[in-house]
Protein backbone atom coordinates (compact mmCIF):
# COMPACT_ATOMS: atom_id res chain seq x y z
CA UNK A 1 0.00 0.00 0.00
CA UNK A 2 1.39 3.35 -0.92
CA UNK A 3 1.97 6.16 1.54
CA UNK A 4 3.11 9.78 1.51
CA UNK A 5 6.52 10.32 -0.06
CA UNK A 6 9.06 12.78 1.26
CA UNK A 7 11.72 14.96 -0.24
CA UNK A 8 15.01 14.62 1.54
CA UNK A 9 17.11 17.64 2.34
CA UNK A 10 20.18 16.26 0.55
CA UNK A 11 22.41 18.36 2.75
CA UNK A 12 20.87 21.60 1.54
CA UNK A 13 20.63 23.28 4.94
CA UNK A 14 16.94 22.39 5.24
CA UNK A 15 16.69 22.49 9.04
CA UNK A 16 14.53 24.92 11.00
CA UNK A 17 15.91 28.23 12.19
CA UNK A 18 15.63 28.93 15.88
CA UNK A 19 12.03 28.75 16.97
CA UNK A 20 10.33 31.77 18.52
CA UNK A 21 8.81 31.18 21.97
CA UNK A 22 5.30 31.50 20.52
CA UNK A 23 6.06 29.37 17.48
CA UNK A 24 3.43 26.59 17.29
CA UNK A 25 5.07 24.66 14.48
CA UNK A 26 6.41 21.24 15.12
CA UNK A 27 10.02 20.48 14.47
CA UNK A 28 10.32 19.27 10.87
CA UNK A 29 12.17 16.19 12.02
CA UNK A 30 9.18 15.13 14.10
CA UNK A 31 7.20 14.90 10.91
CA UNK A 32 9.24 11.90 9.86
CA UNK A 33 7.61 9.87 12.61
CA UNK A 34 4.03 10.80 11.88
CA UNK A 35 1.57 8.33 10.49
CA UNK A 36 1.02 10.16 7.26
CA UNK A 37 4.64 10.02 6.17
CA UNK A 38 5.53 8.05 3.10
CA UNK A 39 7.99 5.39 2.42
CA UNK A 40 10.80 6.39 0.12
CA UNK A 41 9.79 5.83 -3.47
CA UNK A 42 11.12 2.66 -4.92
CA UNK A 43 13.66 2.84 -7.68
CA UNK A 44 12.00 2.01 -10.97
CA UNK A 45 13.25 0.52 -14.15
CA UNK A 46 13.49 3.96 -15.73
CA UNK A 47 16.34 5.15 -13.54
CA UNK A 48 18.72 5.07 -16.46
CA UNK A 49 16.27 6.91 -18.69
CA UNK A 50 16.48 9.96 -16.42
CA UNK A 51 20.09 10.57 -17.37
CA UNK A 52 19.97 9.14 -20.87
CA UNK A 53 20.39 12.54 -22.50
CA UNK A 54 22.70 14.05 -19.89
CA UNK A 55 26.05 15.00 -21.46
CA UNK A 56 29.17 13.19 -20.30
CA UNK A 57 31.16 15.35 -17.88
CA UNK A 58 34.86 14.59 -17.30
CA UNK A 59 35.59 13.97 -13.61
CA UNK A 60 38.37 16.61 -13.54
CA UNK A 61 36.31 19.39 -15.13
CA UNK A 62 36.76 22.77 -13.40
CA UNK A 63 33.99 23.75 -11.03
CA UNK A 64 32.91 26.71 -13.18
CA UNK A 65 32.35 24.43 -16.17
CA UNK A 66 30.40 21.97 -14.04
CA UNK A 67 28.12 24.82 -12.97
CA UNK A 68 27.55 26.05 -16.53
CA UNK A 69 26.90 22.50 -17.77
CA UNK A 70 24.51 21.43 -15.01
CA UNK A 71 22.63 24.74 -15.25
CA UNK A 72 21.38 23.77 -18.72
CA UNK A 73 19.84 20.50 -17.48
CA UNK A 74 16.35 19.95 -16.14
CA UNK A 75 16.11 19.74 -12.36
CA UNK A 76 14.69 16.23 -12.50
CA UNK A 77 18.22 15.04 -13.30
CA UNK A 78 19.83 16.68 -10.27
CA UNK A 79 19.22 13.88 -7.72
CA UNK A 80 21.06 11.41 -9.95
CA UNK A 81 23.88 13.82 -10.75
CA UNK A 82 24.41 14.55 -7.07
CA UNK A 83 25.42 10.92 -6.58
CA UNK A 84 28.34 11.16 -9.01
CA UNK A 85 30.77 13.09 -6.82
CA UNK A 86 31.15 15.57 -3.98
CA UNK A 87 31.83 18.30 -6.54
CA UNK A 88 28.54 17.66 -8.30
CA UNK A 89 26.69 17.58 -4.99
CA UNK A 90 28.34 20.85 -3.98
CA UNK A 91 27.34 22.51 -7.25
CA UNK A 92 23.73 21.32 -7.10
CA UNK A 93 23.30 22.80 -3.62
CA UNK A 94 24.99 26.11 -4.49
CA UNK A 95 23.58 29.58 -5.07
CA UNK A 96 25.86 29.95 -8.12
CA UNK A 97 24.00 27.20 -9.96
CA UNK A 98 20.60 28.85 -9.57
CA UNK A 99 21.98 32.26 -10.44
CA UNK A 100 23.45 30.78 -13.61
CA UNK A 101 20.12 29.11 -14.46
CA UNK A 102 18.43 32.48 -14.14
CA UNK A 103 21.02 34.25 -16.29
CA UNK A 104 20.81 31.75 -19.15
CA UNK A 105 17.02 31.43 -18.99
CA UNK A 106 16.84 27.77 -17.95
CA UNK A 107 14.65 28.23 -14.88
CA UNK A 108 11.55 26.05 -14.51
CA UNK A 109 8.16 26.46 -12.83
CA UNK A 110 7.74 24.35 -9.70
CA UNK A 111 4.37 23.74 -8.06
CA UNK A 112 3.86 23.66 -4.30
CA UNK A 113 0.58 22.80 -2.65
CA UNK A 114 -0.48 23.19 0.96
CA UNK A 115 -2.35 20.13 2.24
CA UNK A 116 -4.02 19.40 5.54
CA UNK A 117 -5.60 16.15 6.68
CA UNK A 118 -8.96 16.09 8.43
CA UNK A 119 -9.60 12.40 8.98
CA UNK A 120 -9.30 10.85 11.47
CA UNK A 121 -7.81 13.97 13.14
CA UNK A 122 -7.11 17.49 11.94
CA UNK A 123 -3.46 18.17 11.11
CA UNK A 124 -1.75 21.49 10.48
CA UNK A 125 -1.17 22.21 6.78
CA UNK A 126 2.11 21.00 5.29
CA UNK A 127 3.86 21.87 2.02
CA UNK A 128 4.12 19.32 -0.78
CA UNK A 129 6.09 19.71 -4.00
CA UNK A 130 5.04 18.38 -7.40
CA UNK A 131 8.25 17.25 -9.04
CA UNK A 132 9.25 15.20 -12.04
CA UNK A 133 10.99 11.92 -11.38
CA UNK A 134 12.04 11.79 -15.03
CA UNK A 135 10.98 13.54 -18.21
CA UNK A 136 7.39 12.35 -17.93
CA UNK A 137 6.23 11.07 -14.53
CA UNK A 138 5.14 13.41 -11.73
CA UNK A 139 5.23 12.80 -8.00
CA UNK A 140 3.72 14.81 -5.13
CA UNK A 141 6.11 14.69 -2.18
CA UNK A 142 6.12 16.10 1.34
CA UNK A 143 8.82 18.73 1.95
CA UNK A 144 10.08 17.55 5.33
CA UNK A 145 12.38 20.50 6.00
CA UNK A 146 9.47 22.96 6.11
CA UNK A 147 7.39 23.17 9.29
CA UNK A 148 3.60 23.03 9.43
CA UNK A 149 1.82 26.24 8.51
CA UNK A 150 -0.76 28.15 10.51
CA UNK A 151 -4.30 27.38 9.30
CA UNK A 152 -5.69 30.45 7.59
CA UNK A 153 -2.34 31.81 6.44
CA UNK A 154 -2.13 33.74 3.18
CA UNK A 155 0.69 33.36 0.65
CA UNK A 156 2.23 35.00 -2.41
CA UNK A 157 5.21 34.10 -4.59
CA UNK A 158 8.04 36.22 -5.98
CA UNK A 159 10.59 34.38 -8.10
CA UNK A 160 11.87 31.38 -6.15
CA UNK A 161 10.33 32.52 -2.85
CA UNK A 162 7.02 31.91 -1.09
CA UNK A 163 5.96 34.52 1.45
CA UNK A 164 3.65 33.21 4.21
CA UNK A 165 1.69 35.65 6.37
CA UNK A 166 -0.60 35.36 9.34
CA UNK A 167 -3.00 32.55 10.17
CA UNK A 168 -4.43 31.09 13.35
CA UNK A 169 -2.28 30.10 16.31
CA UNK A 170 -3.49 27.84 19.08
CA UNK A 171 -6.81 28.81 20.64
CA UNK A 172 -7.71 30.46 17.31
CA UNK A 173 -5.57 33.53 17.97
CA UNK A 174 -4.66 35.49 14.87
CA UNK A 175 -0.95 35.75 14.08
CA UNK A 176 1.27 38.58 12.85
CA UNK A 177 3.96 36.09 11.86
CA UNK A 178 5.64 36.43 8.45
CA UNK A 179 8.32 34.22 6.97
CA UNK A 180 9.79 33.46 3.58
CA UNK A 181 10.56 30.07 2.03
CA UNK A 182 13.52 29.73 -0.31
CA UNK A 183 12.32 27.02 -2.70
CA UNK A 184 15.81 26.46 -4.13
CA UNK A 185 16.97 24.83 -0.90
CA UNK A 186 13.73 24.42 1.10
CA UNK A 187 14.94 26.69 3.88
CA UNK A 188 12.96 29.39 5.63
CA UNK A 189 13.46 32.41 7.88
CA UNK A 190 11.39 34.95 9.74
CA UNK A 191 10.68 38.41 8.37
CA UNK A 192 9.32 41.53 10.02
CA UNK A 193 5.88 40.85 11.52
CA UNK A 194 2.76 42.51 10.18
CA UNK A 195 1.42 45.43 12.18
CA UNK A 196 -1.95 43.71 12.53
CA UNK A 197 -2.66 40.06 13.34
CA UNK A 198 -4.59 38.48 10.46
CA UNK A 199 -6.11 35.19 9.37
CA UNK A 200 -7.78 34.20 6.08
CA UNK A 201 -6.64 37.51 4.56
CA UNK A 202 -6.31 38.27 0.85
CA UNK A 203 -2.84 38.98 -0.55
CA UNK A 204 -1.29 40.09 -3.82
CA UNK A 205 1.95 41.27 -5.42
CA UNK A 206 1.91 44.51 -7.38
CA UNK A 207 5.08 46.26 -8.58
CA UNK A 208 7.19 43.98 -6.39
CA UNK A 209 5.31 44.97 -3.20
CA UNK A 210 3.16 42.58 -1.14
CA UNK A 211 -0.31 43.78 -0.18
CA UNK A 212 -2.40 42.08 2.52
CA UNK A 213 -6.10 42.92 2.86
CA UNK A 214 -8.54 42.07 5.64
CA UNK A 215 -8.36 39.09 7.94
CA UNK A 216 -8.81 41.34 10.98
CA UNK A 217 -11.29 43.63 12.65
CA UNK A 218 -12.42 46.05 9.99
CA UNK A 219 -10.82 49.48 10.46
CA UNK A 220 -9.99 51.96 7.73
CA UNK A 221 -6.50 52.78 8.97
CA UNK A 222 -5.02 49.29 9.05
CA UNK A 223 -7.24 46.97 7.02
CA UNK A 224 -4.64 47.05 4.22
CA UNK A 225 -0.88 46.70 4.75
CA UNK A 226 1.97 46.71 2.24
CA UNK A 227 5.34 44.97 2.64
CA UNK A 228 8.56 46.17 1.02
CA UNK A 229 10.63 43.06 0.32
CA UNK A 230 13.80 45.11 -0.11
CA UNK A 231 13.65 46.93 3.23
CA UNK A 232 11.73 44.23 5.17
CA UNK A 233 9.21 46.78 6.44
CA UNK A 234 5.41 47.00 6.68
CA UNK A 235 3.31 50.13 6.27
CA UNK A 236 -0.41 50.78 6.58
CA UNK A 237 -2.16 51.78 3.36
CA UNK A 238 -4.64 54.60 3.99
CA UNK A 239 -7.82 54.08 2.02
CA UNK A 240 -11.53 54.64 2.19
CA UNK A 241 -13.00 51.57 3.86
CA UNK A 242 -15.14 49.39 1.65
CA UNK A 243 -18.82 49.79 2.56
CA UNK A 244 -19.61 46.45 0.98
CA UNK A 245 -17.54 43.91 2.93
CA UNK A 246 -18.06 42.30 6.31
CA UNK A 247 -15.90 43.08 9.35
CA UNK A 248 -14.15 39.73 9.84
CA UNK A 249 -14.55 38.02 6.51
CA UNK A 250 -12.45 34.98 5.65
CA UNK A 251 -11.14 35.85 2.20
CA UNK A 252 -10.72 32.29 0.98
CA UNK A 253 -11.51 33.30 -2.60
CA UNK A 254 -9.50 36.10 -4.18
CA UNK A 255 -7.33 36.81 -7.22
CA UNK A 256 -5.43 39.65 -8.90
CA UNK A 257 -6.42 40.99 -12.31
CA UNK A 258 -5.42 44.30 -13.90
CA UNK A 259 -3.71 45.48 -10.69
CA UNK A 260 -6.89 44.96 -8.69
CA UNK A 261 -7.47 42.32 -6.05
CA UNK A 262 -10.94 40.79 -6.41
CA UNK A 263 -12.41 39.35 -3.22
CA UNK A 264 -15.43 37.17 -2.52
CA UNK A 265 -16.68 38.41 0.86
CA UNK A 266 -19.65 36.25 1.76
CA UNK A 267 -22.37 37.28 -0.66
CA UNK A 268 -20.53 40.50 -1.50
CA UNK A 269 -17.96 40.90 -4.25
CA UNK A 270 -15.48 43.70 -3.77
CA UNK A 271 -12.36 44.83 -5.59
CA UNK A 272 -9.48 46.89 -4.28
CA UNK A 273 -7.48 48.99 -6.74
CA UNK A 274 -3.98 48.54 -5.35
CA UNK A 275 -2.50 51.47 -7.26
CA UNK A 276 -5.43 53.85 -6.95
CA UNK A 277 -6.06 52.72 -3.35
CA UNK A 278 -9.83 52.68 -3.72
CA UNK A 279 -12.60 50.11 -3.31
CA UNK A 280 -15.13 49.05 -5.92
CA UNK A 281 -18.24 46.91 -5.81
CA UNK A 282 -18.28 44.57 -8.79
CA UNK A 283 -20.99 42.21 -7.58
CA UNK A 284 -24.39 43.55 -8.66
CA UNK A 285 -26.77 41.22 -10.43
CA UNK A 286 -25.79 40.72 -14.03
CA UNK A 287 -22.06 41.13 -13.46
CA UNK A 288 -20.63 38.20 -15.38
CA UNK A 289 -17.34 38.02 -13.47
CA UNK A 290 -19.03 36.48 -10.46
CA UNK A 291 -20.63 33.59 -12.35
CA UNK A 292 -17.93 30.96 -12.45
CA UNK A 293 -14.84 31.85 -10.44
CA UNK A 294 -15.97 30.76 -6.98
CA UNK A 295 -14.91 27.11 -7.20
CA UNK A 296 -11.73 26.48 -9.18
CA UNK A 297 -9.87 29.35 -10.81
CA UNK A 298 -6.49 30.96 -11.54
CA UNK A 299 -5.04 33.82 -13.59
CA UNK A 300 -2.79 33.25 -16.63
CA UNK A 301 -1.50 36.21 -18.66
CA UNK A 302 -4.03 38.55 -17.07
CA UNK A 303 -6.95 36.30 -18.03
CA UNK A 304 -9.08 34.52 -15.44
CA UNK A 305 -9.68 30.80 -16.03
CA UNK A 306 -12.28 28.75 -14.19
CA UNK A 307 -13.52 25.16 -14.17
CA UNK A 308 -17.32 25.09 -14.12
CA UNK A 309 -19.89 22.38 -13.37
CA UNK A 310 -21.23 20.59 -16.42
CA UNK A 311 -24.73 21.97 -16.08
CA UNK A 312 -23.61 25.61 -16.16
CA UNK A 313 -21.73 25.74 -19.45
CA UNK A 314 -21.13 23.74 -22.60
CA UNK A 315 -17.38 23.57 -21.96
CA UNK A 316 -15.66 22.58 -18.70
CA UNK A 317 -13.20 25.51 -18.77
CA UNK A 318 -14.08 29.15 -19.38
CA UNK A 319 -11.96 32.29 -19.53
CA UNK A 320 -12.75 35.87 -18.49
CA UNK A 321 -11.14 38.76 -20.35
CA UNK A 322 -11.39 42.02 -18.37
CA UNK A 323 -11.27 44.04 -21.58
CA UNK A 324 -14.37 42.29 -22.92
CA UNK A 325 -16.13 42.05 -19.54
CA UNK A 326 -17.40 38.56 -20.25
CA UNK A 327 -16.71 34.82 -20.15
CA UNK A 328 -15.79 32.75 -23.20
CA UNK A 329 -15.33 29.00 -23.61
CA UNK A 330 -11.84 27.55 -23.82
CA UNK A 331 -12.06 25.73 -27.13
CA UNK A 332 -10.74 22.23 -27.67
CA UNK A 333 -11.38 20.99 -24.13
CA UNK A 334 -14.57 18.97 -24.39
CA UNK A 335 -14.16 17.09 -21.13
CA UNK A 336 -12.10 16.86 -17.96
CA UNK A 337 -11.51 13.85 -15.72
CA UNK A 338 -14.33 13.43 -13.23
CA UNK A 339 -12.51 14.82 -10.21
CA UNK A 340 -14.25 16.49 -7.28
CA UNK A 341 -13.42 19.98 -8.53
CA UNK A 342 -15.08 21.76 -5.62
CA UNK A 343 -12.34 20.25 -3.45
CA UNK A 344 -9.48 20.62 -5.97
CA UNK A 345 -6.98 23.41 -6.58
CA UNK A 346 -5.79 24.93 -9.87
CA UNK A 347 -2.77 27.14 -10.49
CA UNK A 348 -0.83 28.81 -13.29
CA UNK A 349 2.08 26.49 -14.06
CA UNK A 350 4.32 28.23 -16.55
CA UNK A 351 1.35 29.29 -18.68
CA UNK A 352 -0.50 25.99 -18.27
CA UNK A 353 -3.38 25.06 -15.98
CA UNK A 354 -2.36 22.51 -13.36
CA UNK A 355 -5.14 20.90 -11.32
CA UNK A 356 -4.65 18.72 -8.23
CA UNK A 357 -7.61 16.74 -6.95
CA UNK A 358 -9.22 13.41 -6.18
CA UNK A 359 -11.99 11.31 -7.67
CA UNK A 360 -13.38 10.71 -4.19
CA UNK A 361 -14.84 13.40 -1.99
CA UNK A 362 -13.22 14.20 1.34
CA UNK A 363 -13.20 11.36 3.89
CA UNK A 364 -14.01 8.80 1.19
CA UNK A 365 -11.47 6.09 0.47
CA UNK A 366 -11.08 3.41 -2.14
CA UNK A 367 -11.21 -0.36 -1.63
CA UNK A 368 -7.68 -0.35 -0.25
CA UNK A 369 -8.32 2.42 2.28
CA UNK A 370 -6.46 5.04 0.24
CA UNK A 371 -7.23 8.34 -1.45
CA UNK A 372 -5.58 8.80 -4.84
CA UNK A 373 -4.35 12.27 -5.80
CA UNK A 374 -4.38 13.12 -9.50
CA UNK A 375 -2.81 15.92 -11.51
CA UNK A 376 -4.43 17.27 -14.68
CA UNK A 377 -2.20 19.34 -16.98
CA UNK A 378 -3.95 21.59 -19.52
CA UNK A 379 -1.93 23.46 -22.17
CA UNK A 380 -3.26 26.81 -23.43
CA UNK A 381 -2.88 28.58 -26.77
CA UNK A 382 -4.17 31.91 -28.00
CA UNK A 383 -5.02 31.76 -31.71
CA UNK A 384 -4.73 34.65 -34.18
CA UNK A 385 -8.47 35.27 -34.01
CA UNK A 386 -8.19 35.77 -30.25
CA UNK A 387 -9.81 32.49 -29.26
CA UNK A 388 -8.24 30.52 -26.42
CA UNK A 389 -7.69 26.83 -27.09
CA UNK A 390 -6.77 24.20 -24.56
CA UNK A 391 -5.59 20.61 -24.57
CA UNK A 392 -5.42 18.09 -21.73
CA UNK A 393 -1.79 17.04 -21.97
CA UNK A 394 -1.65 14.57 -19.12
CA UNK A 395 -3.50 12.91 -16.27
CA UNK A 396 -1.10 11.55 -13.66
CA UNK A 397 -1.52 9.68 -10.39
CA UNK A 398 0.90 11.60 -8.17
CA UNK A 399 0.32 10.16 -4.69
CA UNK A 400 -1.84 7.99 -2.46
CA UNK A 401 -2.83 8.94 1.07
CA UNK A 402 -4.19 6.85 3.92
CA UNK A 403 -5.78 9.99 5.33
CA UNK A 404 -8.28 12.37 3.82
CA UNK A 405 -6.42 15.29 2.18
CA UNK A 406 -7.73 18.84 1.87
CA UNK A 407 -6.00 21.00 -0.73
CA UNK A 408 -5.68 24.41 0.92
CA UNK A 409 -3.91 26.23 -1.90
CA UNK A 410 -1.41 25.79 -4.73
CA UNK A 411 1.40 28.14 -5.70
CA UNK A 412 4.02 28.14 -8.46
CA UNK A 413 7.56 29.45 -8.08
CA UNK A 414 10.39 29.79 -10.60
CA UNK A 415 13.59 27.88 -9.82
From Swiss-Prot:
Segments of this protein annotated with the region Disordered: 1-58
Kelch repeats: from-to residues: 161-208, 210-254, 260-309, 311-355
Compositional bias segments (type: Basic and acidic residues): 19-45
InterPro entries, per database record: F-box/kelch-repeat_ARATH, Kelch-typ_b-propeller, Kelch_1
Protein's UniProt keywords contain Repeat: yes
Domain of life (superkingdom): Eukaryota
Keywords linked to the UniProt accession: Kelch repeat, Repeat
Disulphide bridges, residue numbers: none
Entries under Gene3D superfamilies matching the protein: Kelch-type beta propeller (2.120.10.80)
Stretches assigned to the F-box domain: 56-103
Pfam families: Kelch_FKB95
Keyword Ribosomal protein: no
PANTHER family: F-BOX DOMAIN-CONTAINING PROTEIN, F-BOX/KELCH-REPEAT PROTEIN SKIP4
Protein name stated in the entry: F-box/kelch-repeat protein At2g29600
Organism: Arabidopsis thaliana (Mouse-ear cress)
Classification of source organism: Eukaryota, Viridiplantae, Streptophyta, Embryophyta, Tracheophyta
Amino acid sequence: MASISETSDDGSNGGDPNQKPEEPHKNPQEGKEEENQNEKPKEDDHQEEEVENVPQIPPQMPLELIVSTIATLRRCHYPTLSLLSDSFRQVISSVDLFQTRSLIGSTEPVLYTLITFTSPNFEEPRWFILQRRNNTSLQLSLVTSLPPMFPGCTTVTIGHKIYVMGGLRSLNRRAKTVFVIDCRFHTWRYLQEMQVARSYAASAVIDGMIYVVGGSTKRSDDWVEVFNVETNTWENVPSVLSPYGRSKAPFNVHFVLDNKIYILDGNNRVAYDLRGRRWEDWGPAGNQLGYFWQVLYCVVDNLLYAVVPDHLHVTPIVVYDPREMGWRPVMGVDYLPNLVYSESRMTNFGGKLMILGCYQSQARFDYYGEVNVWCVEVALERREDGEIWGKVQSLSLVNKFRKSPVFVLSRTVTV
